[in-house]
Amino acid sequence: MQLSHHYATDLSETVSAVTPQPLSDLTLCLTNTALAEQFNLPTDWFTDQGIIEQIFSEQGALGKQAVAQKYGGHQFGQWNPYLGDGRGLLLGEVSDDKGAQFDLHLKGAGQTPYSRHADGRAVLRSTLREYIGSEALHHLGIPSSRSLCMFTSNERVYRELPEPGAMMIRMASSHLRFGHFEYYFHSKEFDILDKLMDFTLTRHFPDCASQTEPHKALLKASEEATASVIKENLRLIHQEQSKIMEVFRCLHFINTFFF
């Protein structure tokens, strides 16, 4: 298993380095053994305090280059530039034997520059719901993030009432959002927008990445020689988004909550 940090290093302008903040008496309570084996993750991570030390100790590999991502988005029909990872941290990327690269992302990791006065924590109730729901979606053949492991704690997190705190590590082929691109477009930081597109194409659309000025070619058919590649990649983006929308609508999936 090789842990890499391509997003954090290649797009350093789009992230903030954040040290994960542990909850008290953190305990590993659930592990997705099959997913860990798929990515050849070290078995000693999932015994006793192994992965907890990897995230939170000074010697641990997982927390050393943890970053929070900056992005914007639309809320209640209005553009909001003040979003970002308010309680989650990208720990790095790992690959399986087939070359598929997935992010490791810690949720409930504490405050970040994008927490907007929130505590950056997650509660047991919603964390368990996400853990089970993500795996259920995956095994139903519906595109989703995956649940790698979950931690419980006796530390109380205050919502409407005090609740037990929790954390989880989820995995996904990408944590890129439309809001990443929207933020740098609206802020007119076009150099960063170009770098973001380069990264996206290299990781997710390598055929298009081999073209001259691929990040521009994907969105603007300015050269006849690349027109077929452009159309194909736009078709793939549309196709993948359509698949997700179709199955979510069939299941009455609303606003990232499971009911």
Located regions from the model:
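Phosphate-handling architecture centered on phosphoinositide signaling
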Residues: 1-126, 135-136, 140-144, 148-149, ...
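Short, well-ordered amphipathic alpha-helical segments that serve as non-catalytic structural scaffolds
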Residues: 32, 133, 228-232
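Detector for Asparagine
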Residues: 32, 40, 80, 154, ...
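ATP-dependent phospho-/nucleotidyl transfer catalytic cores
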Residues: 127, 157-259
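Short beta-strand micro-motifs within the conserved protein kinase catalytic domain, predominantly
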Residues: 150-157
